[in-house]
Each structure stands twice: as structure tokens, then as C-alpha cells.
Amino acid sequence: MIGLIKTYDNTLDAQSCNNLIDKFEQFKNQHESFDDRGIVFTQLNMAKASQIWKTEIEKYTKIFQNSFTKYLTDLEISPQQMPSKYMWEPIRIKRYLPNDHDEFKPHVDVNSKQTSTRFLVFFIYLSDNEEGKTTFPQLDSYAECKKGSLLMFPPMWPWLHAGTKPIKEAKYIMQTYLHYV
């Protein structure tokens, strides 16, 4: 199971990460706040303002697609193991503040009929953070919050994971999922 968790450094350059954070902060009217049972963060869904985010949606969907191809190659996954048709979940940016409150406690990303079509997670860290990592507690593994790096893994129950609290500065990630259609 741990072999299906992959991290790719330098998927985005520092300037692209900074630009995404700046634009996220510029459009506060698009922010959605979540605070429910240990799940605390602020999110922006690019699809809800697709004209403002059109360039980013196109650019980063291509990067996610290329990363998916690399993941399949690196893991020697054959075409018969993947769906021939799939779709991307809208790209979101999430911010976790260093306030001893924002975090995403252990969970899985497929836990209902609504989320059951997800089959692969993509997280790009937009900021460096000495904490705020993604942990896989049952697998005794974690991914550092390293600016520009991409974390990919299946979203189902064997990959219980958590986004730990950032300590000194905000943590930003850009994420999407691949879905069965």
C-alpha cells in the first residue's frame, strides 16, 4: 500500500506557487471556511469563478495530467488497471492557518456515495512548512509540506491520512482528484 504513495518534487516552480497564493488571498470573496469535527481550513474552488481562474485551470490540469501519466509509468500500472475514461474534480486551493486550530484530522477521501467515484488524490504544496505535513498514521509514513512538490495516492480506506497543524506560517495546497465516469 505504501508503494502507491508517491511524491514528486519540483512539480511547480516557486514563482507559480507564490502566484497562486497571492491570487487566493486577493479573492477573499471566493473563500469558503470549514470547521467541523477536526476539519478546519479555508478553501477556494476555482470552478466557482472559472472566468477568473481560466488560465490556472487549463495550466494546472495539464500539469496534473502529466503527473498522472508519470505515476502510471513509475508504478508500472497497465492500461487494464485504470479506467479508459475519467474526469477531474474541480481544482481547489486550501489554506491552513498556524493558529493551533486549522488541521485535517485522520480521514479518507472516499467515504460516501458522493465521493465514491474518486480514485486518485493530487496535492501540490504551495508553501514550505516545517509542520503541516500529510501523515499516513496506519502506514507510519508522511509527506513533507515542501513548496512545489506533488503528493499522489489512492483516496480509499487503506490510505487513512491527516493534514497536521502548521506551526509558524500558513500552509497552502492545491488539490484535485481523478474520478471514474
Show the residue positions of the predicted features.
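Fe(II)/2-oxoglutarate oxygenase catalytic core
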Residues: 1-150, 158-181
